[in-house]
């Protein structure tokens, strides 16, 4: 496995792979890897080569968010990548990604102002800008992203289509702890009491899925049922609960096919997200 920190060197390695007609699967991460990331790596191994990038992107954090305290353990991350058959770990620093006088950004005017985008101003501009750069540097064939960041997946798919990137975005299922909590690097922030309270988030998701399976169509009733579960936990503050069209992120009144049910909530000071997809509904 190669551990690369230079943009120039990464581009040269990719150029060599491509000259031998090797396909590239790419997993973008901010590090502090967990089983959710490793499931993306496993999916990426269907390609000839697998690249994992580790970059805590300052551009996608707001002024009062957790950039400085975001969990980092590079040595552990590199070992996990090596143990799971990754071919290249790309770890650039911010000075390489954002040169002096950097002034070019990728912005979007529609789906980024909903859900997390409405709460985290500038977040998706940072995500799209850094991923556009990574796509240009690493020239992947397929990019593997987790459904837990569902809105991000949709936003990046739109960017790929709009800017004619020659790659495919593959969305992979949410990986959960044994008790149901969605795997997240931020789970490490939770105290023991907060960790117990956080289960209300996944429980609200599972209840909503059950209601849909039982035939409930009224989204206001589903949202209220989810809200009732979350409000029982005094350590939880709801950020949003929404049911939206998965492609447009527009709110809907009645359940149909291709609907995203999404929750964001603060457990203590930690913001967690979770979701479910309604697909194949007849």
Swiss-Prot record:
It comes from the Bacteria. It catalyses: (R)-pantoate + beta-alanine + ATP = (R)-pantothenate + AMP + diphosphate + H(+). GO terms for biological process: pantothenate biosynthetic process. Keywords: ATP-binding, Cytoplasm, Ligase, Nucleotide-binding, Pantothenate biosynthesis. It holds the Pfam family Pantoate_ligase. ATP binds at residues 30-37, 146-149, 175, 183-186. GO terms for cellular component: cytosol. It is found in: Cytoplasm. GO terms for molecular function: ATP binding; pantoate-beta-alanine ligase activity. InterPro entries: Cyt_trans-like (IPR004821), Pantoate_ligase (IPR003721), Pantoate_ligase_C (IPR042176), Rossmann-like_a/b/a_fold (IPR014729). Its EC number is 6.3.2.1. Belongs to the pantothenate synthetase family. Homodimer. Catalyzes the condensation of pantoate with beta-alanine in an ATP-dependent reaction via a pantoyl-adenylate intermediate. The reaction proceeds by a bi uni uni bi ping pong mechanism. This is Pantothenate synthetase.
